[in-house]
């Protein structure tokens, strides 16, 4: 397995996405599944909408740097089934992130308040459409959470087997 590190922009974007996705997933599922007081529920929603709105332009940057700064593979690894699984897993993560972000915007039933600094208009006003995208968003969030758990599990398995892949994503 190659020991080449990811570029600094890729590392920074990865950990930024990781922190926000883990926070938004845990707090979002808690907000959905638990009977939280209304003030806490609204606070979580406000923070999650603001944080994930921040991810939208960063997602474009992340795609750019993934293509512009690829990490070299060892030739033997390129044909290995685990390498293909890793590529498919990462592609699924990117697709799920994109779907969660897009459906999150399209499900909004009110303007998007970005940390009280900027208010973006609600893109759709038809209740059937916002309800549809709300449903898509919920399923996409579950899929993303499962993919993140699988991603973390794969990293732990690699570490346990003596392949320190995590070191490639650390400064």
Model region roles, listed by residue range:
Residues 1-171:
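Membrane-embedded alpha-helical bundles that constitute the cytochrome b-like, heme-associated redox core
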């Amino acid at each position: 397995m190659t020991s080449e590190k990811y570029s600094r922009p890729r590392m920074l974007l990865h950990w930024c996405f990781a922190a926000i996705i883990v926070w938004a997933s845990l707090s979002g599922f808690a907000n959905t599944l638990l009977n939280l007081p209304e003030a806490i529920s609204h606070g979580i929603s406000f923070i999650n909408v603001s944080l994930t709105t921040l991810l939208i332009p960063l997602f474009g940057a992340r795609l750019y740097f993934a293509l512009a700064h690829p990490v070299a593979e060892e030739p033997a690894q390129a044909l290995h089934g685990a390498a293909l699984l890793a590529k498919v897993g990462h592609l699924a993560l990117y697709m799920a992130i994109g779907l969660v972000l897009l459906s999150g915007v399209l499900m909004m039933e009110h303007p998007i308040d970005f940390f009280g600094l900027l208010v973006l208009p609600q893109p759709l006003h038809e209740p059937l459409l916002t309800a549809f995208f709300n449903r898509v968003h919920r399923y996409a969030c579950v899929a993303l959470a499962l993919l993140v758990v699988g991603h973390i599990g794969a990293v732990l398995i690699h570490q346990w087997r003596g392949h320190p892949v995590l070191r490639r994503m650390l400064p």
